[in-house]
Amino acid sequence: MLRHALLLPLLLGSSVAVAASDLPGQQGPTAALLQGGGLQLSTRRTAELFPDGNRIWKVELHRGPTLLASWPAASGVAGRQSADRRWSPGNAAPLPAGLYSLGRPEPWGNDLWFDLTPRFGTTRSALGIHRCYPGTGCICIPERADIDALARWVKASGIRSLKVVN
């Protein structure tokens, strides 16, 4: 039986997904992970859904092709995922795709807020990353431990941009 358990990863090859908890930067930066620069922060919609039907987004930290951390998030409410994302403020649509300037984490009540400033034309404003659920247009990270880990990365590495992929 042990032989089969050891062969399974070899047989499945790259189709085995890495659990977020296994990613080297999931809990925050280490001195070794901060070496080398070239960090990119992005977020993307997935095909996955939270139990209540809201779309799962992923906030991901990469160095080149290597995924260092991945945190589940939400943006927009379930019924508004295909609404106009660029020109209709207040419609609960997800964050528009594009490049954003990322502010440093700052206190927001008992939580954290990262300001997001679009680097493209849009009528959307007051955008950010914060802890909430469900999302109503910002990037909402439901778990406190996840937003705290992201804050440690942003503070320690100086990341100042976020790409919304899709």
Provide a role label for each language-model segment.
Residues 4-5, 89:
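Hydrophobic alpha-helical context, especially transmembrane and signal-peptide helices
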Residues 5-15:
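Bacterial N-terminal signal peptides
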Residues 12-13, 131, 140:
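Generic detector of well-ordered secondary structure
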Residues 19-133, 148-160, 165-166:
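Cell wall/extracellular polymer interaction/catalysis modules
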Residues 135-143, 147:
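Active-site nucleophilic cysteine motif
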